[in-house]
C-alpha cells in the first residue's frame, strides 16, 4: 500500500475542513482517504474499504499522535489507542526546529487559526531547560503569534534525537530561539531553501 499525504489546501477530492486539518491522504495513487478531526481525541475516517484501515490510521497518527479514537462514517469504532495528555504551552517556551515559514501556507492557515485549541503540536522536552522543541506545526504557531495568541496546545512525543538536535542547533545559529524569530519566505523560496537544507542533511547521513 502506497500512502501519500496531501499537503495542499485546494484539492477537489477532499472536503475543505479535512484539507485544513491535514487529514487528506491518497492511497496507491487513486483512492482518497480522509480523517476529519471532530474533537481533541477523535477523527472520522472516510474510505471506500475499511479492511486494512489500521495501516492508514498509523500513517495519520505519525502526524497527529494526539488523535486516539477513530470512527467510520456511521459512527462505528475502527480503532482506539491510549489517550495522549494534552497541555497548555506558552509560545515563548517553544524552540523551533525549522527556520522558515511558507508565505502561501501562512495565508491558508490564517483562515482557521483563531484560538489556542486550533493549534495542537508535538513537542519534545529540551534538556536542562524549561523549553520545549517543536517537531511540527510551525506555520500554525507563527500564525497564532501574529494574531496575539500566547499559548497553544501541545503533547509530548519522546526525547530529543540526533536530527532534531542538529536542526535546533542550526536554528539557533541563525538567531531563531522562538517562533517569532522565524523568517517568512515566498512559496518558491521556501521550497528551494528548506528542501535543499533537508535534502543535504539526510543525504550526508546516508553517506556516514
Question: Model segments located where?
Answer:
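Basic- and aromatic-enriched surface patches that contact anionic nucleotides/nucleic acids
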Residues: 2-23, 128-208
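Short alpha-helix boundary/capping and kink motifs at helix termini
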Residues: 4-135, 145
Amino acid at each position: 500500500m502506497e500512502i501519500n499525504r496531501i499537503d495542499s489546501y485546494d484539492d477537489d477530492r477532499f472536503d475543505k475542513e479535512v484539507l485544513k486539518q491535514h487529514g487528506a491522504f491518497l492511497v496507491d495513487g487513486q483512492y482518497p482517504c480522509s480523517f476529519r478531526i471532530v474533537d481533541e481525541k477523535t477523527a472520522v475516517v472516510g474510505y471506500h474499504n475499511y479492511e486494512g484501515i489500521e495501516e492508514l490510521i498509523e500513517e495519520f497518527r505519525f502526524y497527529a499522535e494526539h488523535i486516539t479514537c477513530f470512527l467510520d462514517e456511521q459512527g462505528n469504532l475502527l480503532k482506539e489507542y491510549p489517550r495522549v495528555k494534552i497541555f497548555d504551552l506558552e509560545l515563548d517556551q517553544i524552540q523551533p526546529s525549522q527556520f522558515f515559514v511558507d508565505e502561501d501556507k501562512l495565508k491558508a492557515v490564517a483562515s482557521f487559526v483563531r484560538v489556542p485549541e486550533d493549534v495542537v503540536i508535538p513537542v519534545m522536552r529540551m534538556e536542562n531547560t524549561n523549553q520545549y522543541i517543536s517537531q511540527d506545526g510551525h506555520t500554525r504557531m507563527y500564525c497564532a503569534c501574529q494574531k496575539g495568541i500566547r499559548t497553544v496546545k501541545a503533547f509530548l512525543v519522546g526525547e530529543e534525537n540526533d536530527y532534531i538536535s542538529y536542526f535546533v542547533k542550526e536554528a539557533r545559529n541563525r538567531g531563531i530561539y522562538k517562533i517569532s524569530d522565524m523568517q517568512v519566505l515566498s512559496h518558491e523560496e521556501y521550497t528551494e531553501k528548506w528542501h535543499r537544507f533537508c535534502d543535504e542533511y539526510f543525504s550526508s547521513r546516508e553517506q556516514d
